[in-house]
Structures are given as C-alpha cells and as structure tokens.
Amino acid sequence: MVGAIRQGLGRDTATTFLIIDAQSEKNTDTAENKGFDGGKLISGIKRHIGVDTNGLPHMIHVTTANVTDRAGALEAFALCKDNLTNVQKVLADGGYTGEPFAAATYETLGAAVEIAKRSELHKFAVIPKRWVVERSFAWLEKCRRLWKNCERKLNSSLQMAVLAFLALLSKR
C-alpha cells in the first residue's frame, strides 16, 4: 500500500532515505511485557518506526521500553530488511549516535547514518526533516487505542500500530 501511494506521488515504490525514531508509551495494568525507559521515566513499550520524507511507514517494530533506541532500531532493520533494500541514508536523532550503531546499520542495510543534532541546547527548534517522523507519531496518537499500551503481547501492540497506519493510508 505504501508503494502504491508513493507511485501516486510520482516517486519510486521503495525509499532511499529513511527517518527513524522511537516513542515510549505507558502500559496499562493488563500488559504482560513491561520495561522501564530511564530517560523518559516511563514503564511500558517503545515503538520504533522508520518513515520516508512523506511520513509513510517503511518499518515498524515494538519492544519493551528498556530496550535502547539503537538496539531497537537494529532489531527493526533486521526484521524489515526486505522492505529497506534501496535505503542509502538513515536520518536519526541524537539517541542513535555512536560508531557501533553506524557500522551495524551499514552492515545490515548498506546505508550511511546521519545524526540530526540540535544547534543549541535547551532551546526549542524544529529540526528540518526530523519533524516528518514526529508527525507520523502524531498520526498514530490520533488512534485512541494507541494512546496507552492496552495489549497483553508485544505482537498485538505491533499489529495495532500497523492497523492504525493502514487506516491512515487508506484515506489517502
């Protein structure tokens, strides 16, 4: 479905530029899989997504919140490798810094990693191209079921995110 929308926009079906990010989400009491994200002080899950420059999803992965952004992204790359064959560059935020992540990304996808850093600390500024992935997370948040993790299993949480994106894409 993503490929068809990209063709309608006059683009190739597979993206060459991927923007990645992770979002921590709180669990409800029914969830079995729990982890604690020490950076955001959230007990729950993390959604790792990779989108193109239009905000269309090419990679979705769900882990417990204690998994680092780098480790979750590498897991997602390995799982979604067939969808990411044409990717040449990956844009990420400061949570993905480090040579081991860049080397593992190159080994898995054959893509270079570019880190989008803020120019000044403690000042809000929209980082060009990074807002696209944040907008995609905002689209997911419009789905009421995804505002908290209500699912018992991680795979169920993943499928709910996929269904939410399918509902969004079917409206395009």
Regions found by a protein language model. Name each.
Residues 1-172:
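Short alpha-helical elements
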